[in-house]
């Protein structure tokens, strides 16, 4: 794909995700305030990196990206639930997210917790409801199992717990990487792995795509840490310096800002290498990799 067509493809897929997310919330039966709280954070914008990684992986394997849309939306729901809970006073106590008041500031802590719970559980419902012969029951089962592992106490939740335990402590590089491989990386990896499952990747392609995603996940978090120092609040949508004020361990704090930038470049190059080795039509995935390296929000 030429660059223009890559950008067009990603824009079209992002719009498809936005439309589907709204449709999934609209069809829910339940308390209006709960639906409103779920929609508030889910439809607050964002890069939609995780759904785009899944859909781009399906496309890279020569399949119709639309087949992966329900799983892409499930991933975004789980990501959004994690942000709602992450912002709570008992966690990071943030007032802004994506340039808007955080969920608990608008709906109260109790409803924010329930909105997160609703998004987390609804995500699994979406995958169970897939009725598409291109995703047979055996693949759906693996998608559910690996999503539970990526999002749960061996994945994202483990990373968040380790992150909280590490506040105010001096961590080693391996301890910091454990946090980020789990808190951020596991769901990014799942996004690509799910795309590989849906797209029918062989064992070698799956292995290389998994490695691509692992390096991309670390690069994403390192860039996030750098933006917490260098970013503009109006672009990143949250207060600059919140990591430092919360005594969080970060790559710049451990390696210096220059060292963090070197580490970012290392992981981006490694991700690109594994993507090339996967021998797929990875233009959109390569473009996302470039966006992660250079993003300002």
From Swiss-Prot:
Mg(2+) 1 binds at residues 86, 92. Gene3D superfamilies: Farnesyl Diphosphate Synthase (1.10.600.10). Its cofactor is Mg(2+). Mg(2+) 2 binds at residues 86, 92. Pfam families: polyprenyl_synt. Keywords: Cytoplasm, Isoprene biosynthesis, Magnesium, Metal-binding, Transferase. It is found in: Cytoplasm. Signal peptide: none annotated. It catalyses: isopentenyl diphosphate + (2E)-geranyl diphosphate = (2E,6E)-farnesyl diphosphate + diphosphate. Changing residue 73 to F/S: No loss of activity. InterPro entries: Isoprenoid_synthase_dom_sf, Polyprenyl_synt, Polyprenyl_synt_CS, Prenyl_diphosphate_synthase. Its main location: cytoplasm. (2E)-geranyl diphosphate binds at residues 97, 183-184, 221, 238. Binds 2 Mg(2+) ions per subunit. Its EC number is 2.5.1.10. One of its GO terms (molecular function) is metal ion binding. Isopentenyl diphosphate binds at residues 47, 50, 79, 98. One of its GO terms (cellular component) is cytoplasm. NCBIfam families: FPPsyn (NF045485). PANTHER family: FARNESYL DIPHOSPHATE SYNTHASE. Belongs to the FPP/GGPP synthase family. This is Farnesyl diphosphate synthase. The lineage of its organism: Bacteria, Bacillati, Bacillota, Bacilli, Bacillales.
């Amino acid at each position: 794909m030429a660059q223009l067509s890559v950008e067009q493809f990603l824009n079209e897929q992002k719009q498809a995700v936005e439309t589907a997310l709204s449709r999934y919330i609209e069809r829910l039966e339940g308390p209006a305030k709960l639906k409103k709280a779920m929609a508030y954070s889910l439809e607050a914008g964002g890069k939609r990196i995780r759904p785009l990684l899944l859909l781009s992986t399906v496309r890279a394997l020569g399949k119709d990206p639309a087949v992966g849309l329900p799983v892409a939306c499930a991933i975004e729901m789980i990501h959004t639930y994690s942000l709602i809970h992450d912002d709570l006073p008992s966690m990071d106590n943030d007032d802004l997210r994506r340039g808007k008041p955080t969920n608990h500031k608008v709906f109260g802590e109790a409803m924010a917790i329930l909105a997160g719970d609703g998004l987390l559980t609804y995500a699994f419902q979406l995958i169970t409801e897939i009725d598409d012969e291109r995703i047979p029951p055996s693949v759906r089962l693996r998608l559910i199992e690996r999503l539970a592992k990526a999002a749960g106490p061996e994945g994202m939740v483990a990373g968040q717990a380790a992150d909280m335990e590490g506040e105010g402590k001096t961590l080693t590089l391996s301890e910091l990487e454990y946090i980020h491989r789990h808190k951020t990386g596991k769901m990014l990896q799942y996004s690509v792995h799910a795309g590989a499952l849906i797209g029918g990747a062989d064992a070698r392609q799956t292995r290389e795509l998994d490695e691509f995603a692992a390096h991309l996940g670390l690069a994403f978090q390192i860039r996030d840490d750098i933006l917490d120092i260098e970013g503009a609040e109006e672009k990143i949508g949250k207060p600059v310096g919140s990591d430092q004020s919360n005594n969080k361990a970060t790559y710049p704090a451990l390696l210096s800002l220059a060292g963090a930038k070197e580490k970012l470049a290392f992981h981006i190059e490694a991700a690109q290498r594994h993507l090339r080795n996967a021998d797929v039509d990875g233009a959109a995935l390569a473009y996302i990799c470039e966006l992660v390296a250079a993003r300002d929000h």
